[in-house]
């Protein structure tokens, strides 16, 4: 039985981690940390946990974590783990980081997109960015992919890796539920401004753009850039990504469909659907559902991918990475059915 700590327990992703591990047969959450409410029971803040846990919130203590736990999860906003995780890196202690602090390998690019960082390059390079359905977690510092990046990369991987599309033609239209913005209050997330509405935000400036570009470049060195837009939709959770690209010469739709089937045939959490997927099909699960369509008039392939931003886009994939790192079946504790 592995013991783990969660830093950022009062956030959406932190609480989702706790929910997953409650059902994980090989893990016990023994330490939970937040920036306030020390000594108070978690169930005092989340009444739905009454009778399920007696854990109390503690002030962050890296020495305590390394002495009493086998791994630590950072379910924190950008800028936190780059300060608090350095001791763990120095001691080669297992960390799964759900934030964007260690996802980019280039310090100059990191500073451009995340701003105001004092992170040193040697620390930035210490982590392994691991898209769990494509790679294998091996390093003791795992940078968990972002929600938009996860849905986009899983949609594009077979195409980019196998050179099936014109790389200069990639357009991605990504939509997120409100929990993707975290718990911070703003006009953009105010109920009155969100309900019965849809709005675009961070056009051409979302921090997941360089993360996506970095990985696509690894898969195909000829990749240069993509057009990526993000919108908020009035649902509590979920990511709905529509990706478009021109099909390269010598490839037909059947060949492309077969490529997706072959790439993901052995993957536990990627499902290639015969029809276009619905967002509700994946809510509460670690699945990514993908649907394909081809327009022969324009020679454009449409790829729709849907995930739960708090599961596959955050906590679910983090546990999948943890399972890989510690030698468990990667699906252990993650076989949730979609909620109705």
From Swiss-Prot:
InterPro entries found in the cross-reference section: AGPR_AS (IPR023013), AGPR_type-1 (IPR000706), NAD(P)-bd_dom_sf (IPR036291), NAGSA_dehydrogenase (IPR050085), Semialdehyde_DH_NAD-bd (IPR000534)
Keywords: Amino-acid biosynthesis, Arginine biosynthesis, Cytoplasm, NADP, Oxidoreductase
Record's GO cellular component terms: cytoplasm
Cystine residue pairs: none
Domain of life of the native organism: Bacteria
Main location: cytoplasm
Catalytic residues identified in the record: 147
Enzyme class: oxidoreductase
UniProt cross-references to CDD domains, sorted A to Z: AGPR_1_C (cd23934), AGPR_1_N (cd17895)
Its EC number(s): 1.2.1.38
Catalytic activity reported: N-acetyl-L-glutamate 5-semialdehyde + phosphate + NADP(+) = N-acetyl-L-glutamyl 5-phosphate + NADPH + H(+)
UniProt xrefs under Pfam families: Semialdhyde_dh (PF01118), Semialdhyde_dhC_1 (PF22698)
Subcellular location field: Cytoplasm
Pathway the protein contributes to: Amino-acid biosynthesis; L-arginine biosynthesis; N(2)-acetyl-L-ornithine from L-glutamate: step 3/4
Biological processes, Gene Ontology terms: L-arginine biosynthetic process
GO MF annotation: an example: NAD binding
PANTHER family the UniProt entry points to: N-ACETYL-GAMMA-GLUTAMYL-PHOSPHATE REDUCTASE, CHLOROPLASTIC-RELATED, N-ACETYL-GAMMA-GLUTAMYL-PHOSPHATE REDUCTASE, CHLOROPLASTIC-RELATED-RELATED
Family membership noted in the UniProt record: Belongs to the NAGSA dehydrogenase family. Type 1 subfamily.
Function: Catalyzes the NADPH-dependent reduction of N-acetyl-5-glutamyl phosphate to yield N-acetyl-L-glutamate 5-semialdehyde.
Protein name: N-acetyl-gamma-glutamyl-phosphate reductase
UniProt organism field: Lactococcus lactis subsp. lactis (strain IL1403) (Streptococcus lactis)
């Amino acid at each position: 039985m592995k013991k783990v700590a969660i830093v950022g327990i009062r956030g959406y992703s932190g609480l989702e981690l706790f929910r997953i591990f409650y059902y994980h047969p090989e893990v016990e959450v023994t330490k939970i940390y937040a920036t306030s409410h020390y000594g108070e029971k978690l169930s005092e803040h989340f009444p739905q946990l009454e009778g399920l846990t007696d854990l109390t919130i503690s002030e962050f203590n890296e020495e305590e974590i390394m002495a009493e736990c086998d791994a630590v999860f950072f379910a924190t906003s950008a800028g936190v783990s780059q300060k608090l995780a350095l001791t763990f890196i120095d001691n080669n202690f297992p960390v799964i980081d759900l934030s964007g602090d260690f996802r980019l390998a280039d310090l100059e690019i990191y500073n451009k997109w995340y701003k105001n960082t004092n992170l040193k390059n040697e620390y930035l390079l210490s982590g392994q960015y691991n898209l769990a359905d494509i790679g294998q977690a091996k390093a003791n510092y795992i940078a968990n992919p972002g929600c938009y990046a996860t849905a986009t990369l899983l949609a594009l991987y077979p195409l980019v890796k196998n050179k099936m599309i014109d790389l200069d033609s990639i357009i991605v239209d990504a939509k997120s539920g409100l929990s993707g913005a975290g718990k911070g209050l703003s006009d953009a997330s105010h109920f009155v401004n969100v309900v019965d509405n849809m709005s675009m935000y961070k056009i051409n400036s979302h921090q997941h753009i360089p993360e996506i570009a970095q990985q696509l470049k690894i898969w195909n060195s000829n990749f240069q850039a993509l057009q990526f837009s993000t919108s908020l939709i009035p649902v509590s959770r979920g990511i709905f990504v529509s990706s478009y690209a021109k099909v390269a010469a010598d490839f037909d739709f059947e060949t492309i469909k077969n490529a997706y089937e072959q790439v993901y045939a052995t993957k536990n959490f990627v499902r290639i659907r015969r029809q276009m997927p619905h967002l509700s099909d994946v809510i509460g699960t670690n699945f990514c559902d993908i649907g394909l369509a081809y327009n022969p008039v324009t020679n454009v392939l449409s790829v729709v991918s849907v995930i739960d931003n708090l599961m596959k886009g955050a906590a679910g994939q983090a546990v999948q990475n943890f399972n890989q790192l510690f030698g468990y079946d990667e699906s252990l504790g993650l076989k949730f059915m979609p909620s109705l």
